[in-house]
Amino acid sequence: MSNSISFDFLIKVLRKVFLFQNLPDHLVKQLSESITTQEFEAGKAIIEKGDEGNAMFVIISGKVKIHDGNEVVAEINEGNFFGEMALLDGEPRSMSVTAIEHTVVAIINRNDFFNVLNDFPAISKNIITQLTRHLRAQNDVLIAQWRSREKELNDLVEKRTEELANKNSELMLVLDNLKLSQQQLVQQEKLASLGQLTAGIAHEIKNPLNFVNNFSQLSLELLEEFKELTDETERAEILTDLKNNLEKINNHGKRADSIVKNMLNHSRTRNDDKQLADLNKMSDEFLHLAYHGMFANNPDFSCYMKTNFAEKLPKVNVFSQDISRVLLNLFNNAMYAVNKRKKLGVMGYEPSVSVTTSTVNNCVLIEVEDNGTGIPETMKDKIFEPFFTTKPSGEGTGLGLSLSYDIITQSHKGKLSVESVVGQYTKFIIQIPV
Amino acid sequence: MKVLIVDDELDVEQLYRQRFRKEIKAGELEMMFAFSATDAMSVLAELAPMDIVLVLSDINMPGLTGFDLLKFTKEKYPHLNVVMVSAYGDADNMNRASSLGASGFLVKPIDFTLLKEKIFSI
Ligand SMILES: [Mg+2]
């Protein structure tokens, strides 16, 4: 027992403690005799979590907090006690206790406490009541903490949900933009291929138009001659010529017409319906358009063009504009490849692009083959990917083949495949179900 | 006088034959046709070049081009006149033709009066 605190005062204090309220006088006295007191400055630890629980404490003066790290479970002052739990169950301290202000505590040792308990078992009731109170209080604190945590958590979830919703609408916007740019890219690719076509178209129209002009001019002159002639044989000759010329005019007129139709078809934004198309005719026309387009852009360009068209090729229901883009793209690539190989300057190289049609298993096959540079094995998987291009920047959009692939496999439920040997050939095979 | 006309368009034959009907009938002119540069080369190899006075060649033809033919002809038969014919009358093509030794350049559609003059001035 500390010298500064009187025995009587201690008895008074213990009496005030709920736990010892009903304790007989002699036992309170006995307890008081074994008690020691200790002083703690503000901020000093009285109990540390994990300490051995070998005593309980009664606050004689001052104020302490019961806490677990930063979490304060309770603040108690004069007349209250703490540390009885560990005393009962003998477990290490589950909480720390620290003085908030200058505090004096009375320390009741485990053995002394148990002696009192033996002599006066009725105290157990107080202990249980007290424990229940403590537990309840602690429980309330925990529940309150849990509630506030729950609220925090709910708030957090709400905040996150809102953030996600915002992110989501942002992403939707990005997606919309992407779709828009994709459409623009597709349009750009169309325009690029149309640009390439223009030269080919101009040439392909100019040739038949020249014939139309030449033959009609010629026919006018023949008619003049005819009027003056008297010799029947000569007149008959001229009539034959005239008839032939009119046929030529008609043929070349149709040829020009078909090219213009193709061009309009090619540049139109979208075909609404599939139409029955003669793929031989389309292949032939676009092979020549591509050829003249290449030539107009590279005056040195030339290649042999071979066509092997199946005689009774069934007409196929297609989006003809889309198919024409695929054909043009494949022919352009083929011609680009042969031109590239030709530029290597190997003697005796004859650049050649061929197109072959056939029917296999209820499918129309169009094979576009060139004897150009070929495609390395490692690139074969990538060539159908968007933006993949081997051309120098500015020369290709890298969309041609990926669009072609989509057109054949998606819009026409067909197949587009490639075979190639580097330095020998490349063959694209379009397969469209009839 | 024998002229070899080279063009990948088959109908040029009918056109030229009618255009030069009178000259052909009168025996002033004989026309031969080839529909590719390779064809033309074998025609030239077969007929002694002295038999032919003029080659009139298209430039843009599948396979070997008119320029290839021009080069070949000028190397093998330097004295043979070659006149190029093309829908593309740009300076590049014209310069190229003259640097390879062409004796003329006609832009399609052909002005036949001009062509006649050209042929008979040889
Ligand atoms: Mg031509």
Q: Residue spans of the language-model regions?
A:
Chain B
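Acidic catalytic/metal-coordinating carboxylates
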Residues: 36-39, 65-68
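Active-site beta3 strand of CheY-like receiver
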Residues: 49-56
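A Lys-centered signature of the CheY-like receiver
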Residues: 8, 108
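Alpha4 helix (beta4-alpha4-beta5 surface) of REC/receiver domains from two-component response regulators
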Residues: 68, 89-104, 114-117
